[in-house]
A protein has these predicted regions:
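Periplasmic/extracellular electron-transfer cofactor-ligation site
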Residues: 26-81, 88-101, 123-125
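Bacterial N-terminal signal peptides
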Residues: 9-19
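Sec/Tat signal peptide C-region and signal peptidase I cleavage site
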Residues: 19-27
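Short, exposed beta-strand-loop hairpins at the edges of beta-sheets
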Residues: 106-125
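Juxtamembrane/interfacial segments around transmembrane helices
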Residues: 1, 84-86
């Protein structure tokens, strides 16, 4: 293969990686719409608990650590810190990710919805 052919291949590979990466980048506006499912139990804009804990500044927070909310023993003992990766896994299947969690929601089925909700949580805080 010629040098030009290899350079073109590398350029196409790089372009493909950029496109794939941006496909999973979340959209905060769409995430706000998806978050409507969560609003029944969680606030994102005020430090007040509902059925679930508030999600103000949730990224970087140790799971089960918010004062004033009664977490499950499983959540308190999980040792998780909420970052994009742990939050994504939890939002997809809460009861599988933290067995014994009190969260009744079954999870978000679409990876794009998960990414959008995380983008919304980041933008809201």
């Amino acid at each position: 293969m010629s040098v030009f052919g290899r350079m073109a291949g590398v350029a196409l590979l790089g372009f493909g990686l950029v496109v794939a990466g941006s496909a999973m980048a979340g959209d905060a506006v769409k995430g706000e719409k998806v978050f409507k499912k969560c609003k029944a139990c969680h606030y994102v804009d005020k430090e007040k608990n509902k059925t679930g804990p508030h999600l103000v500044a949730v990224l970087g927070r140790e799971a089960g650590s918010l004062e004033g909310y009664k977490y499950s023993k499983a959540m308190k003992a999980s040792g998780l810190v909420w970052d994009e990766e742990t939050l994504a896994a939890y939002l997809k299947a809460p009861k599988k990710y933290v067995k014994g969690t009190k969260m009744a929601f079954a999870g978000l089925k679409k990876d794009k919805d998960v990414a959008d909700v995380i983008a919304y949580l980041k933008a809201a805080n």
